[in-house]
UniProtKB/Swiss-Prot annotation:
GO cellular-component term (any): cytoplasm
First-level EC class: ligase
Name this protein carries in UniProt: Histidine--tRNA ligase
Record lineage: Bacteria, Pseudomonadati, Pseudomonadota, Gammaproteobacteria, Enterobacterales
Top-level taxon of origin: Bacteria
Spans through the membrane: none
Subcellular compartments: Cytoplasm
Classification via SUPFAM superfamilies: Class II aaRS ABD-related, Class II aaRS and biotin synthetases
Family label: Belongs to the class-II aminoacyl-tRNA synthetase family.
Chain's gene name: hisS
Enzyme Commission no: 6.1.1.21
Summary of subunit composition and partner proteins: Homodimer.
Amino acid sequence: MAKNIQAIRGMNDYLPGETAIWQRIEGTLKNVLGSYGYSEIRLPIVEQTPLFKRAIGEVTDVVEKEMYTFEDRNGDSLTLRPEGTAGCVRAGIEHGLLYNQEQRLWYIGPMFRHERPQKGRYRQFHQLGAEVFGLQGPDIDAELIMLTARWWRALGIADHVSLELNSIGSLEARANYRDALVAFLEQHQETLDEDCKRRMYTNPLRVLDSKNPDVQALLNDAPALGDYLDDDSREHFAGLCKLLDAAGIAYTVNQRLVRGLDYYNRTVFEWVTNSLGSQGTVCAGGRYDGLVEQLGGRATPAVGFAMGLERLVLLVQAVNPEFIASPVVDIYLVAAGAQTQSAAMTLAERLRDEMPGVKLMTNHGGGNFKKQFARADKWGARIALVLGESEVADGTVVVKDLRSGEQTAVAQDSVAAHLRTLLG
């Protein structure tokens, strides 16, 4: 017997029972994005490797350790996308979407990072991102955060996420802070683990993200990033906080929040939760005003965020179990024997014409009434339509409410209106 081939570790199948809740959550997210004027952009899964090295930073964990990079048959270095912003910026430059224009874009799809798989964190994961180009004021930063807050309310998880904010300033301000932080860390190298010692010179701001409790205690005495901000960044951040206060959105200023990608400046934010065990990030983003120019375009202000859908699905299931998937089937059509199957299929097509969007399944494969009603239950149908020889002869169909058990014979010409009433 041939050996079974299984999915790659950390790359999961999502089966019909799971995809239904994904579809409902994604539909909610997309509806909110549309209400704020965002348009979808669809991007390649594979990009040229230099795109991510230039955008994310060569000395980041993503580029150094986590990217799936390979050489194609032409000898070009290609990479499965580890995040979406770089590809979105590349597409905007390539197609002339960004120069002197305001754009509000969103994308959704799989991303890839070679990490240790754990709950809610996989090597192939799904991300929804939104990016705004051409606007530089704190008002658009605030609106992006308001958009995400509206998501949480729509999904019933608003009480289980909290917002952390910071400003990491301009490139110049960050360079000054970097020097001060390195000088501090050099004086306390005995407390640093090997990872922090490596990062101290390659990307010292990442030391602020260390989970090592000894390093965290040391950082309590480290220079504060907020003390090195330029005046424009201070004003921008104060404006953002004022707008969030006016909108009633609670937040905590976390001066150790820096984000793991090099392209960020000024505003950075994360929505975090404690409802999945240890604290985890649900959604994160910030401003990246230099990235478009860095990738070959003209200087363009930009801000955006991304959200891991696996973790979001887990959170919704954990704290709002009433947010259930829509049933696969609204109506199940039961046919009494092979001689009525053609009439049943004709009626089903007619109802699909008259009731766009209805989820209607016709029984196939025969079976007595008991078996067919069991199938209707399996698919979660609310209503069964029963068509026998007598109903075919007199142009009626029996409509049975599978919740109440009530049933009535209805003329086929008027059954669509009757079904609309029952389905609400």
